[in-house]
Regions:
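Conserved N-terminal helical subregion
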Residues: 66-141
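Glycine-rich FAD pyrophosphate-binding loop
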Residues: 4-8, 17-41
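N-terminal FAD cofactor-binding segment of flavoenzymes
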Residues: 37-75
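N-terminal Rossmann-fold NAD(P) dinucleotide-binding loop
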Residues: 12-13
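Receiver (REC) domain switch-region micro-motif
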Residues: 3-4, 139
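A generic structural signal for short, well-ordered alpha-helical segments in conserved domains
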Residues: 16-17, 107
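Extended amphipathic secondary-structure runs
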Residues: 21-27, 48, 55, 113-119, ...
């Protein structure tokens, strides 16, 4: 099976990684050279999704993730009044990870996989050419 994925975000990369783990050919298209932007962006992953991600998609060192066991939400209008409070003494509610750390780790590993091929979209006629070639079982944009 041949799958085409268009886009270079974490969602596309996670899907591509999961497919190549299942020995499915993936052609990964993106508009320009992927550059790593140093940013402070983080993403949150629930406990169950974290376990699934580690097992099925990409294992990343646990030291790169920060466990969150307590969340408090306040109102700007009501000073010092908690709107919601979530807390767990045993398990983490979710984990946060730097967006760049996860992306770099995944892209460096997936590029070594023989089922993965990365391509650059050079112009807007790419989409028409892609459809005419008809060499993919599924195209995901």
């Amino acid at each position: 099976m041949n799958i085409c994925i268009i886009g270079d975000g974490l969602t596309s990369l996670s899907l591509a990684k999961n497919l190549v783990n299942k020995k499915i050919n993936v052609h990964f298209y993106h508009k320009n050279k992927i550059e790593y932007l140093l940013s402070s962006r983080t993403i949150g992953i629930s406990e169950n999704n974290f376990e699934f991600f580690q097992k099925e998609i990409h294992k990343i060192a646990k030291k790169k993730f920060w466990p969150i066991k307590k969340i408090e939400i306040y109102s700007e209008k009501l000073v010092q009044e908690k709107l919601l409070k979530f807390e767990s003494n045993k398990n983490s509610l979710f984990y946060t990870v730097k967006n760049d750390d996860l992306y770099k780790s995944m892209i460096s590993e997936i590029c070594k996989n023989k089922f993965f091929k990365k391509n650059i979209i050079k112009d807007n006629s790419f989409y028409e050419k892609l459809l005419k070639k008809n060499k993919y079982d599924l195209i995901i944009n």
